[in-house]
Amino acid sequence: MCIRDRFDATENLDGFVTISNTLKTCAVNLSKMCNDLRLLSSGPRTGFGEINLPPMQNGSSIMPGKINPVIPEVVTQVAFHVIGNDTTITMAAEAGQMELNAFEPVVFYSLFSSITSMTGAVNTLVKNCILGITANEKRCEDLVSKSVGITTALCPYIGYQKAASIAKKSLKTCLLYTSPSPR
């Protein structure tokens, strides 16, 4: 960071607040992605189950065979930590008085902690989770075959009303979409 006004730099820590806020924004987005991964991998029977995360430890103590999404969970916890550090940095920047802010030590500590934690979390997420994600093809095929959303593709050909009628009938009768037979 280039300091243009050294007097301002001893009074105000807004540059550090900006950096911390950017880290917080990254943490929020990373946490949201991890929550999506947890939801998409939930199961084995009653969740979404559309993707498989690499198993990192023995499953749940209350549900043998279940794979817990431990990597997305730990990354989400790091995001909570970074968000908390951002609050600390914001409060420390605000707590300065007049020409001096005596709370720079906690700002530096929190900022370096956030950077270190986020770096480790991203590396762990990529190495131990993202690179090992696979699609649960059987589950996805099953969901597509039971989806009435596929009738949307019919709208340009038969109109919205007829497509909606087919969708409603499919829901009532549990008729499934199947691929056309090869000829």
List the predicted regions and their residue ranges.
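Conserved small/polar residues in nucleotide/adenosyl-binding loops
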Residues: 1-5, 177-182
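Internal glycine-rich alpha/beta core junctions
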Residues: 4-89
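A short structural micro-motif
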Residues: 9, 98, 172-173
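Feature representing long, continuous alpha-helical segments
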Residues: 17, 35, 61, 69, ...
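Generic, well-ordered alpha-helical scaffold segments in large soluble proteins
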Residues: 22, 26-29, 36, 78-81, ...
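Short acidic (Asp/Glu) and glycine-rich catalytic loops that position anionic groups and cofactors
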Residues: 51-59, 91-101, 144-148, 160
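Long, amphipathic alpha-helical stalk/connector segments used for oligomerization, subunit docking
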Residues: 81-144
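Amphipathic, charged-and-aliphatic alpha-helical interface segments
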Residues: 157-174
